[in-house]
Amino acid sequence: MKKQITFLIAFAFVFSLACQTLVPPPKREGTIIADCADILRAVNGVQPVDIPESLIESGVKQGGEFDPNDYFKALTHLSMRDGYALDYVYPIDFLGSFPMLYPRPVDQPPYVSAADVPEGVKLGNFRDQLAIEDVEQGYFEYAVMDIMASQFYLVWHANYNDLLIVCDKDAANEIVDDTNSHDFGMKFDLAQQAQVRALTNVEPVVKLTDDSAIVEIVTFTKWGGFFRRTYTISRSFPHEVDVKGENLVEYDCGIMF
């Protein structure tokens, strides 16, 4: 019986590949972001690896911690609007600490801890003060910033924030191969592997209309699988942003922190 199931899955995979060859996916509208992998490497390159012990213990910044404005060295088509800097506080949460990013007026001293934020004061959403260069790359970089900006200094449960941007089919296949070669949770079964191998239109693409930018990217999380994430961003400030997700391949590592 097991051999029959394996044969059927293998047949389904081969049949799927044949269908892709005979009936190729429809041509996509927009501009493919060919340097996706280079951009992600640049962002990963500025993100810190280790969390300062003093920050974990107290939640108080003492100087020398990560400066999130360094993101704009990697994402060169983004910046904060005039009069604002990107900043964060680090509330201590023993179930999982993570940075809370906010747009800080440049004439306002930074808060060194979450306890310094006056009661009733809302820090605001940093995305609301992002300046986006009105080109395809700018809107792609917005999506990168939206996903990756808070993925540093993560502790315990905060590591559920593991969303990855998948730049092409090779990257998708590498995720499967890497997952199945390690002993971290569940592996991709044969059916899931076949679904990933059959994915099409993985590369990020940006389409500009008269008033909007539409960004399509594929993402992966160990707690959900592969998704197609579509951003619709108005091209004029203030930018209205709508995000929709479509699950392409379901997967769950089964790990619970």
Residue ranges and their predicted role:
Residues 5-14:
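Sec-dependent N-terminal signal peptides
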Residues 206-257:
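C-terminal, beta-strand-rich globular interaction domains
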Residues 179-227:
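Acidic, glycine-rich flexible loop segments
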Residues 16-18:
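C-terminal motif of bacterial Sec signal peptides marking the signal peptidase cleavage site
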Residues 1-2:
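N-terminal secretory signal peptides that target proteins for export/translocation
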Residues 20-22:
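Bacterial signal peptide processing site
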Residues 26-199:
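Extended, low-hydrophobicity segments enriched in charged/polar residues
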